[in-house]
Every structure is written in structure tokens, then in C-alpha cells.
Amino acid sequence: MPDSRPDTELSNPQSTKPPLDPHLKALENESIHIFREVAAEFERPVMLYSIGKDSSVLLHLARKAFYPGRVPFPLLHVNTGWKFAEMITFRDEIVKRYDLDLIEHINPRGKAENITPFTHGSARYTDIMKTEALRQALDAGQFDAAFGGARRDEEASRAKERIYSFRTPDHRWDPRNQRPELWNVYNGQIRKGESVRVFPLSNWTEVDIWRYIQAEDIPIVPLYFAEKRPVVERDGMMIMAADPRLELLPGEVKREEVIRFRTLGCFPLTGAIRSTATTLEDVIAELEIATVSERQGRAIDRDQSGSMEKKKREGYF
């Protein structure tokens, strides 16, 4: 599948490109089938685009599903204003390269009240700038289906979520009120006002994602690769200290470390890991011996016991 606009700035570090093995091909086929089912069943689908590795794979699969046509639905980026600068640069280049329709939404209430992760804490910040903002954007666009890049291996509440995740008119998720999914048969019938979150990557693992990125040569944000970067130790995490809005607390010292990120979100709430992985092969080798979840680097998952399920019940991604 050729790029509509070649761009050398969006290339990963040089890597071997192995053929797509049968396991990855089966996952790819399943995901493409889901994209086509949703496009046929629903009137106004949208794809949630958070710019990370899973979103990059999701977008690649969407492009494959409808090639040689354009992706037939818009991308929605819920922008908190606190993303890594590299993520926004990457997003804009991707949109240009693939001729995509992008909707960017920032919660006007959060912006007016100057809600930040520093002043209001991660729980309230996430609720207003992510969950509430997402509900606003979905309502404004009258979208009845929203693709997301969540995987079942990431976290406990996501492990029990179906591929078609039904939401009430106020976007709430009730795990006890979901439909059975038999093989590849999905029931997309909804009542007026209801919607569905759709997760084509449900059955993928983190290593699957990286192997697919390698095999398909999918560009990703450079922050996933190790490099010397400024960091500060805070709340048990290494926070990247490249943004001038990050003010050092008493006793904190900025230093340089060779780091990378396993997961990307808002920079004040995303912890880096020490790593020497500068290529896709290095990243995959590192993950194959990893003993902790990628979500360990997300501060929002530490808010309280069961916090991710609580957020999802309220309408989170």
C-alpha cells in the first residue's frame, strides 16, 4: 500500500523488514473485517486518534481496509494541551501525508478554568480534559461508532471489554449489559442516542503491535526510541523535562538520561523508562523479557484501585 505523499521525516530508525507471519496476518484480517463491518453498519463512525503506537497501527489498518480509497471517516484527537510536542508535530505530518480528515477538540470549560495536571491532580484533570472532552466531541459530531486502539492485554478492565462496547446515551459503559460475540459475528443494532466503542486491536498484544510496525514499516513518534533526554524524578516516575511549563519542585534536579517511552500520553503524567533500544529490533527484544505492563508508566492508572474501570464506566476511552 503506497503512501499518498512520501515524506522522509516520518521514517523510523533503519530496521529489517520481516515478512508478515501467519499470526499477524490473522490479526490483520480480523481488524480489517471489523473496520469494514462498522463502516457498513453505522451511519457516522469516527476513529479516536491519540497519536501513539496503537493509534498508528489502527490508522494503518483503516487505510488498508478501504484502499485505494480514502479513509471514509474522520479522526478525532481529544487534545488536552499537555501532549508531548513531538506528538503534535507527528500528528500534523501524518494528516498531511495520508490526506486525512482530523477533528481536534479541547474542552472549552477546562481551558477557561485552566485545568492542568499540576493544579488539579491527575484524576480531575483526566475527567475534565479527556472523559468530558470526549463526550462533548462525540455529541457534537453525532457519532454512533468510535474506533479505539485499546487492547485486552493492557489492563484488567480492558480485558473484559468486548470488541463492540455498547454505551448509553450519556456514553457510560456497563460491563454487565454487553452482548455476546460469537466468532466474527457482531451485533451493531443500537437504540436512538446509544453508541458503540469499537476496538479492532482487542486481540493484539504489545509485542504483536511492535512486530506489525516492523513488518509493515509503520512510522511512529520518535519518543518510542531511546535517546538522551532531560528528565526529572517525580512520584516514582521519570518525567521528561523538555517543556518549559514543567516547574521543578523543591529538591528536584533536572538531569539527562538515555530513555524511551513504552506508552505516550500527557507528558506530566507519563513516565519514561531507562533503555538503550534505538531500533525496532531492540524494542521487541526488550519487550520479550519485560515483566511489567506498559501501563505502569501512566500516572492516571494509579489514582485509585479500579480507577481505569471507573473512568471507562464514566465514558473514558
Swiss-Prot record:
It catalyses: sulfate + ATP + H(+) = adenosine 5'-phosphosulfate + diphosphate. It comes from the Bacteria. Keywords: ATP-binding, Nucleotide-binding, Nucleotidyltransferase, Transferase. Pathway: Sulfur metabolism; hydrogen sulfide biosynthesis; sulfite from sulfate: step 1/3. GO terms for molecular function: ATP binding; sulfate adenylyltransferase (ATP) activity. PANTHER family: SULFATE ADENYLYLTRANSFERASE SUBUNIT 2. This is Sulfate adenylyltransferase subunit 2. It comes from Rhizobium tropici. The lineage of its organism: Bacteria, Pseudomonadati, Pseudomonadota, Alphaproteobacteria, Hyphomicrobiales.
